[in-house]
Amino acid sequence: ENIALAFSGKYDKSHAEHYLSKHQATLASRLSHWRDVQLARKALHMAGDPDLVLDLPCGAGRFWPMLAEQPNRVIIGSDNSSNMIATAMQSQPAHVVSRVRPLQTSAFDINLPDQSVDSIFCMRLIHHVGDPAHRAKMLREFHRVTRDTVIISLWVDGNYKAWRRQKLEAKRAARRKETGYQNRFVLPAGQVESEFEQAGFSVVGSL
């Protein structure tokens, strides 16, 4: 089964460039990005500072400078969108890009052999995947490709930021008069942990 998220076809060149700029557009977005980087750095340390990391989806490469801080780390910069990868390769610093191996592939069908990376670094993706069967397929694919860890960001219930996100998504749905389509999901923490375990993972920690 080929799985494509509803928004995945929108990233032409202009959308990819907009995605790059939006994380630096305002003070709030810059602070949010700074916080994301701090948390990601801590998560990598918890994962043993892996040497070979698959950044999927890499987007416009906003985490590449942080991933490249470890001198011997190899980064596979992967995204479903070739425009995203091209934007990342053109916009990130040359000394960082030289450390990156680009790979266009889907998170649901990763074009890599079994146990081929030390860690999969997955930021800002799973909250777009509303179908539990699709999440299960993605997590099973992650389990196949990594030989050690997965670092994954998601929105779970039970905290203020998740509550704000739920309120925002409710407003968006009302404004668009949507009849079932959602692009972002806040998930119950217990459900997420169960899905991880069913895919073969054990939760080492959370931030």
Which residues make up each language-model segment?
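Conserved class I S-adenosyl-L-methionine
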Residues: 1-47, 149-173
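A conserved beta-strand element that flanks and buttresses the S-adenosyl-L-methionine
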Residues: 121
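A short glycine-rich, Lys/Arg-flanked "PGG" loop and its adjoining helix->strand segment in the class I
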Residues: 136-148
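Short alpha-helix
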Residues: 182-200, 205-206
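Short conserved loop adjoining the S-adenosyl-L-methionine
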Residues: 109-114
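Short catalytic micro-motifs in class I SAM-dependent methyltransferases
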Residues: 124-128
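Class I SAM-dependent methyltransferase SAM/SAH-binding core
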Residues: 54, 60-108
